[in-house]
Amino acid sequence: MSQQLQQIIDTAWENRAELSPKAAPADVREAVAHAIEQLDKGLLRVAEKKDGDWVVNQWLKKAVLLSFRLEDNAPMPAGGYSQFYDKVPSKFASYTAEDFAAGGFRVVPPAIARRGSFIAKNVVLMPSYTNIGAYVDEGTMVDTWATVGSCAQIGKNVHLSGGVGIGGVLEPLQANPVIIEDNCFIGARSEVVEGVIVEENSVISMGVYLGQSTKIYDRETGEVTYGRIPAGSVVVAGNLPSKDGTHSLYCAVIVKKVDARTRAKVGLNELLRGD
C-alpha cells in the first residue's frame, strides 16, 4: 500500500503546477489524505532509523506540500475566543474524551498541534506548537512556548525546555528534518534547525543555537564538526577565535561526554557546571 501511495504522490508532485482545490484527480486527493492520516496516527514517519542510520521519506514531505495545494483556507473556530483561517485543521478538532484517553497524552491550553503530526503516549504538550509531519515520541515534554517544526522527529523521553525552537523542513524539499534522539535535554531558548541531528542522551544547555553552518567544537579532541551532536554530549554556547585573532565567532562547545548511566544519576546542572 505504501509503495502505491508513494507512486501516486511522486507523480502528482511532478505535475503539482496543475493541481488546485478545484482541479485534482480523485486518486491524488485520496492518496494525499491517506498519507496525512497515516502521519497523524504515527503509522508512517517522514524519517525513520534503519540499521543505525536515519532515512528520510521524501515522498511524505511531498504529500504534506501537496495537501496545501489541494485545500482552500477556511475559518476554524478556536473555542469561542477567536478564529483561525488556514488549510490545516487542529489535530484535536474532532477529539472526544475517549479519543484523548486512548491517546494517553496531555494537552495544556492553548497548545496547538496540527493534523498530520503524531503525539505518542505520555507526552505533555504545554502551551506550545507542533507542526504538521512532526513525530513526538513517548514520554516527551514539550514545554511552554516551544515549537516543533514541520516533519521534525523527537525521540522518547526528550525534554524541550521553555521557548525551544526545533526547525521545520518543508522548504527546501531536499533538506532533512531536525532529529532529536531519545533521552535528550534541550535547554531553554535553544534552537536546533536545518536538519541537525542531536544523538541520544545528549544535554544541550540554555541558549545554544545549532544549524548546518554552526561550528561544533569538541573540547577534548579539538575537532570541529558540523550538523551532528554525538551521543552523550554535553553542549554549551561558546566562541572560537578567528585565524588572525581580531575577532571571535559563535560556536557550540562539547564540554564532555557522558554515558546513559551517568546521565541518569547526575543532575543536569551538575553536568553543565562541571569543568
From Swiss-Prot:
Pathway(s) annotated for this protein in UniProt: Amino-acid biosynthesis; L-lysine biosynthesis via DAP pathway; LL-2,6-diaminopimelate from (S)-tetrahydrodipicolinate (succinylase route): step 1/3
Reaction(s) catalysed (UniProt annotation): (S)-2,3,4,5-tetrahydrodipicolinate + succinyl-CoA + H2O = (S)-2-succinylamino-6-oxoheptanedioate + CoA
Keyword hit for Transferase: yes
Keyword flag RNA-binding: no
Annotated residues for binding of substrate: R106, D143
Family: Belongs to the transferase hexapeptide repeat family.
NCBIfam families assigned to the protein according to its UniProt record, in alphabetical order: dapD, PRK11830.1
Protein name, per record: 2,3,4,5-tetrahydropyridine-2,6-dicarboxylate N-succinyltransferase
Gene that produces this protein: dapD
